[in-house]
């Protein structure tokens, strides 16, 4: 064909601008609770997108692309603003009547109708003489039918004529008939078989005939252009004639000349009718009044019909001649002719197929309101994120488990160190250096100078001796004062009324006795420290000599040098043939060399597999991290129960990563098993097994030696801690002794002054009275003095019991307390408190003679009857004796009860018990001793949790 058959295009709908921004802002503020101003740019983009699609474009591909984009954005917009109300004005494509609705569905249907119009125009303008143009025309006509089909299936209530089901259905029929026409043209152009062309032409004629019948129902309604009907009628007869013509050609080729002649007559008759209509159509067609048809539609159609009429006429005349002269076949009737088969028509291209194209997806671009995600989509996305997290956790757990198995297996097999040792055995490059443990190296750095320990031990002995000497001197001072008092009493009986010093010094003697007892226990702890130091001194000296000497000693031990090894190492543990390692045989060397190569190769493979596995896991994590299905969830928001299937299909994207991880884990386990078998095979060798045995013995000896050194280091730390605590104890005890000395001196000085005053008063009265002591009294006094001189003081009283105070109760000052005793007379102290710990400072809270007396304390009242031990006369209170001198001033004892300040300990707490007589301190936690202290044989620390020693011993630190 030299002329192209005209095609009908769908008329275009028209519209005016709408306001998208205001309704969208209202919905964002009301439904999403966000700031509408933050989406001003998105609203402007949507507004421009509509203007470009419906106003600025023509009938070219650019217009089609803009409409594709706008409709795609409408689909996404409806997922977020389904109930939005915007006024959409559209003019009817056939009646030009304005229709305005606020539904998004009306806007979408109008845009699809406009897309179908653009597609039909593209099909109409395509050059079908070119194969590519013919394909585009065929595709666009089918796509137009698909768009119109979507309108009929999804928009049931048409607000305008052009969107009504009947009109849309007719347009679909026209588009499908034109698609069949284009396909028939393609078959003719490609010179396909006559029977195939006949079937296609018959199908096209049938479709045009059906459309003509449908269009006749709209006659007089002013919907369709009447020129459409002329074109459709002409084409129906034209393709009917073509079908008969090509069928006749097929029958003639099959030898059915009579049937072929009848069909040619039918074809000629149909084309003659079409030619008459085409001739009249030329005079009635006005191109300007029918923009949906090409401007040359009448002429082109007339030329096509005329050309086919000529062909049919010539073919009929030739067939008549041939039949009359040659074939002489009887011509069958037209009714008896078999019907021509119809070629099944092509299906319309659906809108899903159009938008499923990657190029169309790119045209649509990203969602304009991508930042605005509905809450339901957020919830579904969270569920999907949790599914992804489960997948990642499962894979990570598998990888970590596999890595743990690999690491444990390598540690169990001692790889790769074991392979290096095999290589050393082969090369004879055995390392005689003995590796020392990190704990032992740290111990060497912490030992320091041991001479300080010896100095501290000597200082400890000196402090203890000085404290004991001073305590005994104080006891002697109290004894001397008591003897002097009794001597004066015997001499001046009965006028000597000074109270006995025994009750007043009971508390002082109790404190002195308790401190002496604690000092005895401390001496035991000091002896224990000295003994412990002597037992570990060789080991500590070795540790303090430095790392180089320590390594040298370790080598001496492993080499079995009896002159150099540590005395703590048993010579029975050393092998006389340690140095002479048994050489491997040649066969074992070859096997070992092969094992070294195999082991290295397997370790390299294992390393690569682990690296690849970790890299795949990282890629999986990154892929899952960047995966986002919010858009898919938004697109499938209207579907019910789609999430499980959607999630399952999306998670399948990560299946390749899971497969690679599983393969890596399986390969690593296989290599680990091979390494295990390799090590076991090497260890089965006789020579190698003997070497391993000796190496194990060597390591055992070194470990035992290190263990003994470490235990010595722990004991050294205990000694240093005990020395610090012991010296601190003696410092505290020295302060307590100093306070006791001051109290004893104050007490003896006061008593001596009181005696001098009393003796002076007695002698003055005797001189004034001219009397002298009776002979019996003198004799008695002399006898008493002799007995006192021979009297040996007993041991001081026992320390006070727990829970009692060591503070004696002094009488109140004159005028405020009882008047029947002197101010220097003190009641007996409470029962002594037994000492549970020699360094327990709790007994210093109420230190004896330093406390202010309590008025409620019991007072001693001497009986009025003569006493055999001291006086022979009744006691005369000082207030009733005019010759008795005024009582001496009351000693200025410390108030509140004496509690000397303790020096702060290093850690703020002292586990040592303070000396007896010291103020009680809050009980401090006792630190448990290390486990090896209880297991150490050969010595045991005294006083650990027991009485005596330095308050539980020096071991508690």
Swiss-Prot record:
Coiled coil: 449-493, 585-626
Stretches with biased composition (Low complexity): 926-944
Ranges of residues in domain BRO1: 6-406
Location (main, coarse): cytoplasm
GO biological process: protein transport to vacuole involved in ubiquitin-dependent protein catabolic process via the multivesicular body sorting pathway
Gly residues composition bias: residue spans: 945-957
Chain intervals with Basic and acidic residues compositional bias: 751-766
Cellular component annotations (GO), alphabetically ordered: endosome
Stretches the record annotates as Disordered: 751-779, 795-957
Compositionally biased spans, kind Pro residues: 826-835, 879-890, 912-925
Listed PROSITE patterns: BRO1
Spans traversing the lipid bilayer: none
Compositional bias annotation for Polar residues: 851-871
Described function: Involved in concentration and sorting of cargo proteins of the multivesicular body (MVB) for incorporation into intralumenal vesicles.
Protein name as it appears in the record: Vacuolar protein-sorting protein BRO1
Gene symbol of the encoding locus: BRO1
């Amino acid at each position: 064909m030299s002329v192209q058959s005209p095609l009908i295009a769908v008329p275009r709908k028209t519209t005016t601008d709408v306001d998208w921004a205001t309704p969208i802002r209202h919905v964002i503020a009301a439904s999403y609770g966000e700031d509408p101003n933050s989406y001003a740019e998105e609203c402007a983009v949507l507004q421009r997108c509509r203007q470009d699609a419906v106003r600025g474009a023509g009938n070219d591909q650019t217009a089609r692309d803009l409409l594709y984009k706008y409709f795609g954005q409408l689909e996404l917009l409806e997922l977020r603003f389904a109930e939005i109300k915007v006024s959409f004005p559209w003019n009817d494509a056939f009646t030009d009547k304005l229709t305005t609705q606020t539904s998004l569905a009306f806007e979408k249907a109008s845009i699809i109708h406009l897309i179908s119009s653009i597609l039909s125009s593209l099909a109409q303008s395509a050059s079908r003489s070119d194969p590519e143009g013919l394909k585009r025309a065929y595709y666009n006509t089918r796509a137009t039918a698909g768009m119109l089909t979507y309108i009929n299936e999804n928009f049931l209530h048409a607000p305008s004529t052009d969107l009504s089901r009947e009109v849309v259905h007719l347009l679909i029929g026209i588009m499908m008939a034109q698609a069949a026409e284009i396909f028939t043209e393609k078959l003719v152009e490609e010179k396909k078989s006559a029977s195939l062309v006949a079937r296609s032409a018959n199908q096209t004629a049938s479709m045009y005939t059906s459309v003509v019948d449908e269009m006749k129902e709209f006659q007089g309604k002013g919907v369709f252009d009447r020129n459409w009907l002329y074109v459709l009628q002409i084409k129906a007869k034209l393709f009917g004639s073509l079908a008969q013509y090509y069928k006749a050609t097929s029958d003639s080729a099959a030898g059915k000349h009579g049937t072929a002649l009848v069909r040619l007559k039918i074809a000629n008759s149909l084309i003659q009718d079409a030619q008459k209509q085409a001739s009249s159509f030329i005079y009635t067609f006005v191109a300007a009044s029918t923009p949906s048809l090409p401007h040359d539609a009448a002429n082109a159609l007339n030329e096509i019909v005329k050309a086919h009429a000529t062909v049919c006429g010539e073919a009929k005349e030739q067939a008549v001649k041939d039949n009359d002269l040659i074939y002489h076949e009887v011509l069958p009737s037209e009714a008896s002719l078999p019907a021509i088969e119809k070629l099944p028509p092509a299906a319309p291209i659906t809108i899903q197929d159009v938008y499923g194209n990657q190029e169309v997806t790119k045209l649509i671009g990203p969602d304009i309101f991508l930042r605005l995600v509905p809450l339901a989509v957020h919830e579904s996305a969270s569920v999907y994120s949790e599914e992804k997290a489960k997948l990642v956790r499962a894979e990570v757990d598998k990888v970590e488990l596999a890595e743990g198995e690999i690491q444990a297996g390598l540690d169990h097999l001692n790889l790769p160190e074991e392979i290096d040792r095999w290589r050393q055995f082969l090369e004879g490059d055995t390392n005689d250096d003995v590796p020392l443990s990190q704990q032992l190296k740290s111990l060497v750095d912490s030992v320091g100078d041991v001479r300080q320990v010896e100095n501290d031990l000597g200082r400890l002995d000196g402090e203890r001796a000085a404290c004991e000497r001073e305590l005994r001197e104080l006891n002697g001072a109290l004894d001397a004062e008591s003897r002097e008092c009794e001597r004066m009493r015997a001499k001046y009986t009965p006028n000597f009324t000074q109270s006995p010093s025994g009750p007043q010094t009971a508390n002082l003697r109790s404190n002195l006795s308790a401190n002496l007892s604690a000092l005895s226990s401390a001496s035991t702890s000091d002896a224990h420290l000295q003994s412990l130091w002597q037992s570990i001194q060789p080991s500590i000296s070795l540790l303090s000599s430095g790392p180089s000497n320590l390594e040298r000693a370790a080598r001496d031990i492993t080499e079995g040098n009896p002159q150099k090894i540590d005395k703590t190492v048993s010579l029975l543990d050393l092998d006389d043939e340690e140095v002479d390692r048994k050489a491997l045989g040649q066969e074992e060397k070859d096997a070992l060399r092969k094992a070294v190569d195999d082991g290295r190769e397997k370790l390299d493979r294992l390393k690569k597999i682990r690296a690849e596995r970790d890299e795949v896991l990282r890629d999986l994590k990154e892929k899952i991290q960047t995966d986002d299905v919010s858009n898919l969830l938004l697109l499938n928001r209207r579907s019910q129960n789609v999430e499980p299937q959607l999630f399952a299909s999306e998670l399948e994207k990560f299946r390749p990563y899971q497969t690679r991880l599983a393969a890596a884990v399986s390969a690593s386990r296989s290599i680990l098993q091979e390494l295990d078998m390799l090590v076991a095979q090497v260890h089965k060798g006789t020579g190698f097994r003997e070497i391993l045995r000796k190496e194990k013995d060597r390591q055992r000896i070194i470990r035992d030696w290190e263990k003994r050194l470490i235990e010595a280091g722990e004991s050294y730390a205990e000694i240093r801690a005990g020395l610090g605590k012991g010296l601190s104890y003696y410092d505290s005890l020295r302060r307590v002794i100093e306070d006791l000395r001051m109290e004893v001196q104050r007490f003896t000085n006061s008593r001596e002054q009181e005696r001098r005053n009393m003796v002076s008063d007695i002698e003055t009265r005797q001189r004034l009275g001219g009397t002298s002591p009776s002979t019996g009294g003198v004799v008695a006094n002399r006898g008493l003095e002799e007995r006192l001189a021979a009297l040996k003081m007993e041991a001081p009283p026992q320390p006070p019991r727990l829970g009692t105070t060591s503070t004696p109760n002094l009488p109140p000052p004159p005028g405020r307390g009882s008047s029947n005793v002197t101010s220097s007379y003190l009641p007996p102290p409470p029962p002594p408190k037994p000492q549970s710990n020699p360094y327990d400072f709790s007994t210093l809270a109420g230190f004896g003679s330093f406390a202010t007396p309590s008025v409620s304390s019991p007072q001693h009242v001497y009986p009025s009857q003569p006493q055999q031990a001291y006086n022979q006369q009744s006691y005369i209170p000082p207030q009733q004796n005019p010759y008795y001198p005024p009582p001496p001033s009351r000693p200025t004892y410390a108030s509140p009860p004496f509690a000397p300040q303790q020096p702060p300990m290093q850690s703020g707490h002292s586990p040592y018990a303070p000396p007896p007589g010291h103020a009680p301190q809050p009980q401090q936690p006792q630190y448990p001793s290390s486990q090896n202290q209880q297991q150490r044989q050969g010595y045991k620390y005294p006083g650990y949790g027991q009485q005596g020693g330095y308050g539980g011993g020096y071991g508690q630190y």
